[in-house]
Swiss-Prot record:
Signal peptide: none annotated. Belongs to the protease inhibitor I13 (potato type I serine protease inhibitor) family. It holds the Pfam family potato_inhibit. The keyword GTP-binding does not apply. The keyword Metal-binding does not apply. GO terms for molecular function: serine-type endopeptidase inhibitor activity. PANTHER family: PROTEIN, PUTATIVE, EXPRESSED-RELATED, SUBTILISIN-CHYMOTRYPSIN INHIBITOR WSCI. Keywords: Protease inhibitor, Serine protease inhibitor. InterPro entries: Prot_inh_pot1, Prot_inh_pot1_sf. The record marks M48, E49 as: Reactive bond. Inhibits both subtilisin and chymotrypsin. This is Subtilisin-chymotrypsin inhibitor-2B. The lineage of its organism: Eukaryota, Viridiplantae, Streptophyta, Embryophyta, Tracheophyta. GO terms for biological process: response to wounding.
Length: 72
């Protein structure tokens, strides 16, 4: 029951919430090797353009994933 794009690639990783940045990067790159992963503090204002090669990781003050990582 994962959310996938038209090429059957995973586009969301809800299972990574509360995991470490390192663990999240490893899992995402296994699923989507071309991903450009960007780590940002939760609450950071970001641009709204959609990029199929980008995954933003919003982290809490302990560098754990605070929001579901998504392609975009």
């Amino acid at each position: 029951d994962c959310l996938c794009d038209c090429q059957n690639q995973k586009t969301e990783w809800p299972e990574l919430v509360e995991k470490s940045v390192e663990e999240a990067k490893k899992v995402i790159l296994q699923d989507k090797p071309e991903a450009q992963i960007i780590v940002l503090p939760v609450g950071t204002i970001v641009t709204m353009e959609y990029r199929i090669d980008r995954v933003r990781l919003f982290v809490d003050r302990l560098d754990n994933i605070a929001q579901v990582p998504r392609v975009g």
